[in-house]
């Protein structure tokens, strides 16, 4: 499922609410949460909520005169789609060139290298 960058900001608010057991959220609550992060008008946020509804990324339930929004798309599923798309677009679906790119541009710190070594050892040991 394709979620735009702006839509992902709205999704983050809904995922955070879900993780902290505050979901579902009304549109006003989403607007209030985003007022601290973005300089968006209420109409923009409601448009983004409607787009996410049409895509099936969120669901809405009626609560009196308002709607409450809950994520359907999990953050983990979105992250997997996004990372696989990035990997495919930029590195022909291969992880090694991605790591090499960051290594060449000095974006890997000692902690990153240690974590990568540990992951490789786990793969060698047959662990997922």
Residue ranges and their predicted role:
Residues 46-50:
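Short, hydrophobic-biased segments on the C-terminal half of alpha helices
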Residues 4-6, 63-82:
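Short, cationic-aromatic polyanion-contact patches
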Residues 20-34:
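Short acidic, hydrophobic short linear motifs in intrinsically disordered regions
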Residues 80-126:
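Amphipathic alpha-helical dimerization/coiled-coil segments
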Residues 56:
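Glycine-centered, phosphate/nucleic-acid-interacting loop/turn motifs that mediate DNA/RNA or nucleotide
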Residues 12-19, 35:
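Short, locally clustered residues in the helix-turn-helix/winged-helix DNA-binding domain
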Residues 5-13, 29, 97:
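Pre-recognition alpha-helix immediately N-terminal to the DNA-recognition helix
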Residues 60:
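Short beta-strand "wing" residues that participate in macromolecule-binding interfaces
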